[in-house]
Amino acid sequence: MLSSFPVVLLETMSHYTDEPRFTIEQIDLLQRLRRTGMTKHEILHALETLDRLDQEHSDKFGRRSSYGGSSYGNSTNNVPASSSTATASTQTQHSGMSPSPSNSYDTSPLPCTTNQNGRENNDRLSTSNGKMSPSRYHANSMGQRSYSFEASEEDLDVDDKVEELMRRDSSVIKEEIKAFLANRRISQAVVAQVTGISQSRISHWLLQQGSDLSEQKKRAFYRWYQLEKTNPGATLSMRPAPIPIEDPEWRQTPPPVSATPGTFRLRRGSRFTWRKECLAVMESYFNENQYPDEAKREEIANACNAVIQKPGKKLSDLERVTSLKVYNWFANRRKEIKRRANIAAILESHGIDVQSPGGHSNSDDVDGNDYSEQDDSTSHSDHQDPISLAVEMAAVNHTILALARQGANEIKTEALDDD
């Protein structure tokens, strides 16, 4: 690829004592520039014109060094000036570029930016003595416009629609989204994979159950909805950016806000691994009641934290058991029992004898919770002693809490009797 460099590059850099080194991007841009049909003298003339414009506007816009730095400035001084005229064939090779009748330079800046409609202002030129001189639009932006600027108008339109959805009644939008998913046959697992929102949160939100989604997650969900409606299947190849946005109980620091429209910056939360001591406590409570209420879940969480709490050390947010984690564990436990019961029914229908579908589960819940499977072997070794101890401690903790509530009620009753 180096052998195909234009001769102008070798002449320009001949004063270097060492062989110049170029990046792949620079080589690609030089090749693109040469393929536009510009000659060596036209390229040098354009670069000299840009240098002169930078010098004239340095007081107003500051000195710029975006054309190769100081090394370029030294190299262009050693190159003779090009021809004073530009051929008509060269002028016609630049679409949208026509020479200005003015003999003076345009003193207004010519930035390489996009307007609100996503179109580049690449049709503005500064001329000298009726000759065309390329504007301050260099090859670097030519390589970028094909993939970074064309979607700006669509992004703005999607943002407007997302804001409109945020202002509408969420219950109506949920019905629309459910119908959309059913008609397109899009599973909630696919939506969860693209947006980074857990499947259970999506399911509960669409079914009007549980807490509402946060504003940022709701915007990400609505953005996916609008993009999928506009371009069916386009979002299926998207993946969330690697910036974690987790549930409020799991969050330790405020999440960063995405500044780039059209990107999803949501990801599933970290996985929580249940310790054996906590599993023993959970199993004991599960055997008593498979559907604990909020107060009971708080009690179970406190019992688990008391078991794993080490003296003089505070549990971190990742280690601490919360009522939400208890809720997910119980839901997964019931789901696993039901799944095993269904499997057992299928096997029995084929005349295969199976054991009770009970037992322990090691399946992951849809929110990313993970707990270890208990050892169902008949051997009872010393490593099970901590579990037995955990069960006893949980029972003691449960008794203490019950006595504390009973004692408080008795104190209130005695106070009323004294009055």
Curated annotation (Swiss-Prot):
Coiled-coil portions: none
GO biological process assignments: negative regulation of DNA-templated transcription; positive regulation of DNA-templated transcription; telomere maintenance via telomerase
Domain named POU-specific atypical: residues: 145-241
Residues marked Critical for recognition and binding of 5'-TTAGGG-3' motifs in telomeric DNA (site): 335
Compositionally biased intervals (Acidic residues): 364-376
Subcellular location(s) of the protein: Nucleus; Cytoplasm; Chromosome, Telomere; Nucleus, Cajal body
Chain intervals with Low complexity compositional bias: 64-73, 81-93
Molecular function GO terms recorded: double-stranded telomeric DNA binding; protein-containing complex binding; telomeric DNA binding
GO cellular component: Cajal body; chromosome, telomeric region; cytoplasm; nucleus; PML body
Chain positions with Phosphoserine modification: 148, 170
Disordered as annotated region, ranges: 56-152, 352-384
Domain HNF-p1 positions: 18-49
Source taxon at top rank: Eukaryota
Biased composition (Polar residues): 94-132
Keywords: Chromosome, Cytoplasm, DNA-binding, Homeobox, Isopeptide bond, Nucleus, Phosphoprotein, Telomere, Transcription, Transcription regulation, Ubl conjugation
Annotated domain remarks: The homeobox domain is required for binding to 5'-TTAGGG-3' repeats in telomeres, and for telomere localization.
Function comment: Binds directly to 5'-TTAGGG-3' repeats in telomeric DNA. Associates with the telomerase complex at sites of active telomere processing and positively regulates telomere elongation. Important for TERT binding to chromatin, indicating a role in recruitment of the telomerase complex to telomeres. Also plays a role in the alternative lengthening of telomeres (ALT) pathway in telomerase-negative cells where it promotes formation and/or maintenance of ALT-associated promyelocytic leukemia bodies (APBs).
Record note on quaternary structure: Associates with the telomerase holoenzyme complex. Interacts with DKC1, XRCC6 and COIL.
Protein name: Homeobox-containing protein 1
Organism ancestry: Eukaryota, Metazoa, Chordata, Craniata, Vertebrata
